[in-house]
Amino acid sequence: MKNPELIIIGAGPGGIAAAVEAARAGVTVKILDENPKPGGRIYGQLNDGFKLLNPGFLGPDYEKGKVLLSEFDTIREKIDYRHDALVFATFENRIMAFHQAGKGQRLPFNKLILATGAYDRPVPFPGWTLPGVLTAGGAQTLVKMQRVLPGKNILFAGSGPLQLVVANQVLDGGGTVAAILEAGEINNWLKLLKGFSRNWGLLTDGLQYVRTIRKAGVPLLRRHMILEAHGDRQVEEAVIAEVDKDWRAIEKTRRILKVDTICLGYGLVPSVELTRLVGCQHRYAADLGGWIPARNEDMETSVPGVFAVGDGAGVAGSAMAMLEGRIAGISTAQSLGYISSEEARKRKKPYLNDMKKMGRLRDALDRISYPRPGLFELAHDDTIICRCEELTLGDIKSAIGKGTTEMNALKRMTRMGMGRCQGRMCAPAVQEIIAGQTQTPAAQIEYLNQRPPTKLVPIKVLESLPGEFEIRHGW
């Protein structure tokens, strides 16, 4: 299948759902995914050599994912599925570049669905670079995929249900959880889920997580946050405190917990590197993770024929990602003439209805758990913000004080975002720092320009790319 009609980047819930709908309609589909197996972060399958003895250990989402993966298997022979294939660039004239097995390849695209997912929000605070501080998502990968505990005495700090999920998996794996700090009001989102109990089974799952945690004797502290981590060569203790409605510490409530691991779960940031590179218009939505591509009801972006689905287009969870993927797959089939507009409307209707119901729930959850200003005020002047270039908050504030109040200008002046992570670990925080220092809404602070490659690739891969490429203006 040299020239597929549709290319899908990402084989998580959104990408797989899109592939299923498009292939069923007759569209020739190629999927490029950087992981060894389909499923993405939520529905990811165990690595070779591991056997799942207790399916319940991976949680209800894993079981839901098996249904989607079974659908995928039924149309697998109709799809050109490439695993371990990393897309790292797009160019003018609708050309993309990816590498697989150490070889660079170029590929023209007509219709494109981007299902690139999201990554854990980085939260700088004193001590966050110590060994033993990791994200809840990273801890979940260790526990789910390798059956390895992230530490011996673990503190969870964040907001929202994800850290409850991971804490349950740690407990099930024999780990010790010192405490769970919920920055928001956990009773609020449990009551909220009760109001939506007819949909998605979220109430049952959430209550079961809380029951397990309380049965294990783990303190579940609402309106609490991590302030600092201390230790010589690794985490040895954490400073925590109660916080107000803006997540600012109530100083008199400070106390110290003896722990060796801190797992942070303050939400996700959409991976928009490829949507930016393609040239899609973006808008800022704090409740959906930050900058996201603007889309219409068909999930199509401002670039004709380019669609975006899942957490990479706004963090809303795996259930929403599947719905968006199905709609994008059907819309693609319609645009290519495989189904009529009437048939497309018929197929999309139940998914659109479910999206509206799910959207109301997500909006309400986001109002409770999205980051408040105090989260971005934890760092001190000597706290490293850009880990790659070892830039501190003081360095960034100094540059801002000299009039450098734009992200790209700050990058040129300080080298912020020029390291291996390409800004993923620092740019979201720097945007909030600029907003706070200049009293400017984050939505008005333009994000970093995107350039290829979007992820690190070996030089030999670039050397092996055939032909020449035209770089889009504005980089």
Spans of features found by a protein language model:
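Residues forming the flavin
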Residues: 1-420, 424-475
